[in-house]
C-alpha cells in the first residue's frame, strides 16, 4: 500500500468510518493532520482502524487520547513500513467481482470466510488482499477439480495455519522484546516505535521463510503420496507383496500437568509444553509419525505403521522425564481411521485416548 495524501472524506472512506469520526479523532489528538486540503496519509487509516477497534472493545477514546497527549502512548508507529502492507478497500464490490468473474456470490462469500476474511454486504467494497484470492477461487470453480466443500476446507487450513503462525510470532514478540523493553523502564510508546523499526528488517525475511517452509511441506506430502501410488501399482502388478497395513494413533498425556501449572504458573507450563513439542516432533519423525493435535498437556499423533507408533511411544516414556518433564502416559491403538480436515476420527482414535487416560 503506497502512502498517498488524502482528504478527510477519502480517509473516512478507506477506514470505513464517517467523516465526523475523523474530525473527532483530530480534535482528540489521535490523528495529527498536516496543512492543506489533503492533510492525511493512507497510513493514517491504520490509526483510525486501531482507535475504532479499541473503542468497540470498550476502551474509552478520551482516555486513549489523554495518554497520547501525555506522551505515554503513540499511534505514530502505525506509519512505519511493516503496516503499509495491510490492505485497504478496493474500488470494486463483491457483487461486481462476482459478475465480472462468473464466480457465484455464495461461493465467493463461503471461500473468503473460510480463509479468515469477512463481509457484511455484497455491495460493499472488497479488500485488496481479497482480490488476490479471487483468481484461485475462479480457477477452482471453473475446473471443478475441487468442489465448494473442499475449497473451503483447504481455505480453512490456510487460515488456521497462518493464524497459528501469527499468534506464536506475537507471543515471541511479547516475551522476548516487549516485556523486557518495558521492564527496562521505557514506555509503551518507545517500545512500539522501536519494534516498528526492527520489524522493517524482519517482515520481508519472514515472508520468504514462510513460503520456503510451505514448499518444503508440500515436497514431503507430495512425495509420500507419490510413493504410496507407486507402491500400490507394484502390488497390483504382482511385483511386490506387502502385508496389509493399518495406521496407528498414539496419545501422550503428562501426569500432574494441571497441578504443575497451579504450582509454577502459566509461564512455566508454557515452557514445558514447548520442550515437549520439540521432543515429540523429533521422536515421531524418526518413526514416520506426525503430531496431529496438541492438547495442552499432551498430544495426538498419527503413524503409518503400528510398529513405529510403539517404538516412538516407548521412546517418549523414557525421554520425557529425562527432559525434566512430568511422567508421560501413552496409549497406542492400531486400526482404520477417518481423516477429515487434517484431523482423525473413529474407534481407533477413541481407544488410543482411553488407554492413555
Language-model-derived ranges and their functions:
Residues 37, 123, 263-264, 341-345:
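Short, solvent-exposed loop/turn segments at secondary-structure boundaries
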Residues 111, 280, 296, 332, ...:
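Residue-level signature of catalytic and energy-coupling elements of molecular machines
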Residues 302-357:
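Catalytic beta-strand-to-alpha-helix segment of the class III nucleotidyl cyclase homology domain
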Residues 42-45, 128, 266-270, 274, ...:
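Short, conserved loop/turn and helix-capping segments at secondary-structure boundaries
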Residues 232-315, 319:
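Catalytic NTP-binding/metal-coordinating core of nucleotidyl cyclase/transferase enzymes
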Residues 154, 202, 272-276, 312, ...:
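Hydrophobic alpha-helical membrane-association signature
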Residues 121, 289, 325-329:
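Short secondary-structure junction motifs
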Residues 1-235:
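Arg/Lys-rich, alpha-helical DNA-contact motif
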